[in-house]
Amino acid sequence: MAATAAGVFRRTPEERADQRLAWNRADQPFFAAGACHILAWVCRDTYPDRPIGLAGLRFAGERQVFHVYATWADRAFDHAGWNPEAELLAANREFERRSLDRIAIVDDMATFCQAQHHRMPHEYFGDPLSRARDYVNRHPLPWR
């Protein structure tokens, strides 16, 4: 699947206000907007023998991260599966029509979620960890 901007799947005001409605979205929109950080952490944790990192995107000069993804070599994993990171960055930059900053994420999930006002897994309507594990396992690996 081609790299696609996370903003294409941005939640509606209704989905932001209703966790059940947000939970019931298809997997790609769910992991593009609202649970991208869960997917990234699960991807990294699924392959502990690989040097998988975490990265985030934010609008240039701003503090708030709006999209999180896993990285390995020159590849990125998010709602669109594994793609060249350069393509993921270009798709998001083009969609947002703004400059973006890419940052490395080194905090644990709890620290990141608190600092960035993201939900922890237990704050979702259902279990996003098992849903993310299933989603990660559907995508071919770039190192094979």
Report each predicted region and the residues it spans.
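A structural boundary/capping signal
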Residues: 1-144
